[in-house]
């Protein structure tokens, strides 16, 4: 049977893609950021995933405001990139695994998630930048992918609770797949940032560091945030943390943090990176399934609310 070998959360800032295209990995401004990924490359060499489930948010390349599904899953044999207008070069297509994707889709629907199925799917920088960061060498790009797009732009957005539960359903789907493959779950986006309005340039370091700690040790508490709480504390585009919730939900309750970094100077987005490994595998992770995680949306009104006034 398939198993989840780990999860990675990483930012997907478009300027990273431009830096990669221009070979700036050793530029003094960029080097501290790119050096943070070297331990991840070593870890990936060690665990050798057979497939990557990539949870990201589309920015208007495949979906737009007139048609924006809450959750969409790719079921194609390949996923093409296209010009988004950011000045990023178009990259070569990524391989898919339709058989796995259809199993994932059918399992999620049986788990009462209404999924938009995409037999053709363009993937934007939120997908391609993380893949380029994690597998920078062309020969490493053979890992098949299953993209999952989460709505983070068109009201109403899915709640952190819903995204965390989606992750749990993805974990169940993976571990019910009959092939013996090692699956990596990647959540892209974040951390805190706001690109427009009165708070343009907003970064909340204290909240970001709280997220990096709680996503490991207490994801259920973090998932109690409402979307409005996330916008308040992480900025309008900081809601991309929803993809981190999906990734964490696909992991077991107990995880081991293998690596994390936090870096701000490359852009007006706080860049986060985290690698997690499951402490348990297989059926052990679902022993508590009968006591399904149930939390409601609520506005956080405790000392944590003070972090909304802290900026880097």
What does each model-identified segment do?
Residues 296, 303-305:
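Intrinsically disordered, low-complexity proline-rich regions
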Residues 50-56, 148, 181-189:
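Beta-strand elements within well-structured catalytic alpha/beta cores of enzymes
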Residues 153, 168-183:
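Non-transmembrane, aqueous-exposed alpha-helical and coiled segments at domain scale
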Residues 1-50, 62-165, 176, 198-296, ...:
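Flexible, D/E/H-enriched segments
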């Amino acid at each position: 049977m398939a198993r989840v070998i780990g999860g990675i959360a990483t930012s997907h800032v478009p300027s990273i893609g431009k830096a990669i295209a221009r070979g700036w990995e050793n530029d003094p401004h960029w080097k501290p950021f790119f050096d943070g990924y070297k331990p991840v490359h070593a870890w990936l060499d060690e665990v050798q995933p057979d497939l990557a489930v990539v949870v990201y948010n589309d920015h208007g390349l495949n979906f737009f405001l007139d048609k924006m599904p809450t959750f969409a899953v790719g079921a194609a044999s390949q996923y093409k990139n296209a010009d988004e207008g950011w000045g990023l070069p178009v990259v070569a297509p990524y391989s898919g695994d339709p058989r796995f994707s259809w199993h994932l889709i059918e399992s999620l629907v049986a788990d009462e998630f209404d999924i938009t199925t995409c037999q053709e799917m363009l993937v934007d920088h939120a997908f391609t930048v993380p893949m380029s960061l994690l597998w920078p060498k062309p020969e490493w790009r053979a890992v098949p992918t299953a993209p999952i797009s989460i709505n983070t732009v068109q009201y109403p957005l899915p709640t952190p609770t819903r995204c965390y539960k989606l992750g749990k359903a993805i974990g169940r789907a993976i571990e019910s797949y009959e092939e013996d493959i090692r699956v990596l779950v990647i959540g892209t986006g974040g951390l805190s940032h706001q690109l427009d309005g009165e708070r343009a340039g907003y970064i909340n370091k204290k909240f970001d560091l709280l997220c990096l700690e709680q996503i490991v040790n207490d994801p259920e508490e973090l998932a109690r945030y409402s979307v409005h709480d996330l916008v308040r504390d992480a900025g309008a585009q900081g809601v991309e943390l929803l993809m981190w919730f999906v990734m964490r939900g696909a992991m077991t309750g107990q995880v081991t943090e293998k690596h994390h970094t936090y870096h701000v100077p490359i852009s007006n987005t706080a860049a986060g990176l985290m690698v997690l490994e499951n402490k348990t595998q297989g059926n052990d992770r679902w022993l508590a399934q009968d006591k399904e995680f149930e939390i409601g949306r609520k506005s956080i009104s405790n000392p944590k609310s003070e972090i909304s006034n802290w900026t880097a």
